[in-house]
Amino acid sequence: LGLYAPFVMQHALALARTFNADLYVVHAVEPMGLFAESVLQSYLDEQALNEFHSQGLKTVIANIEQRVLDSFREELGDDGEQDLQRIRAVRVLQGDPSQVILDQVHKLSVDLLIVGSHSHGVGAETPLGRTAARVLQLAKVPVYLVPLMERRRREDR
């Protein structure tokens, strides 16, 4: 997840506590690029490559989901068990991030979508990241946008 995920999660948990709501954590990863695919093809035979795509990717994604949950558990500490119970699922899905998020909004029938304005600090000078902008444009549910912390600190000066 992005650098600001814990900050976004704090907002999500505060809202969930206030409204006694459940949380679904969705993280989208871009599909494997051509370079990575060609490297795998160089070292794996066709059967091993097919097995990697079917099982290896599932294993990698399951490990990412577990690490995300573990990082939230660590972030919340011993007092956060009740907050952790609010998290119904952590889903890591491959695809275009904005489309993955919008698809999950529909599949999970969510009432409110909470997103960070940027996933990491690289685009800190732009007012809104690509994924956040696209989600804001296309979402059919209200979107709660959490601003980048660095931007807020700079503007406070």
Spans of features found by a protein language model:
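Short, well-ordered secondary-structure micro-motifs
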Residues: F35-S38, L102-D103, E125-T126, E155-D156
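Short glycine/serine/threonine/alanine-rich loop segments
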Residues: A21-D22, V110, V141
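Glycine-rich, Arg-bearing micro-motifs that act as flexible, cationic patches
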Residues: L1, L112-L138, L148, R152-E155
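Structural beta-alpha unit
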Residues: Y4, T18, Q66, D70-L113, ...
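Small/aliphatic-rich secondary-structure junction motif
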Residues: L1-S54, M149-R152
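A structural signal for isolated positions on well-ordered beta-strands in alpha/beta enzyme cores
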Residues: D22-Y24, A89-R91, Y144
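Short, hinge-like loop/turn segments at secondary-structure boundaries
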Residues: L40-L44, K107-L108, T131-A132
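Structural beta-sheet core signal
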Residues: V25-H27, V115, L145
